[in-house]
Amino acid sequence: MWVAVSTDTFSDRFEGVSEWDDTADAIVDCVRDKLRNLGGILVRFESKNAITIANIAHESSHIAMNIFDYIGAKVDLANQETFSYLVGWVADCINQVRTGKFKD
């Protein structure tokens, strides 16, 4: 997962990045890192001010849904704990970018 504060498509680095939607605060794309030949998820925030608790929660759920889809897992009442832990981990990663305080 990559987190960026930019509306750039980073086309020199990633494949699969959508053009910026001017009505959005943030966009999530499933991408391929061309430098390392790795798949992953890129979340872009329009600005540092767009990284709000509400947007972190919203984008984290999109990211977790994409990861569940990729691994063939279903989001349902039977495995909501696993999904919720993943959403929390994603939200924490985004919050580290927001605060500039990164965990080792």
Where are these regions (language model features)?
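Alpha-helical hydrophobic/aromatic positions enriched in membrane-embedded helices and signal peptides
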Residues: 50-54, 73
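A short, structured loop/turn motif at beta-sheet edges
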Residues: 56-58
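N-terminal soluble segments of membrane proteins
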Residues: 1-15, 101-104
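Post-HExxH zinc-binding segment in Zn-dependent metallohydrolases
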Residues: 75-104
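Active-site scaffold of zinc-dependent metalloenzymes
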Residues: 8-51, 63-67
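Catalytic Zn2+-binding segment of zinc metalloproteases
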Residues: 60-77
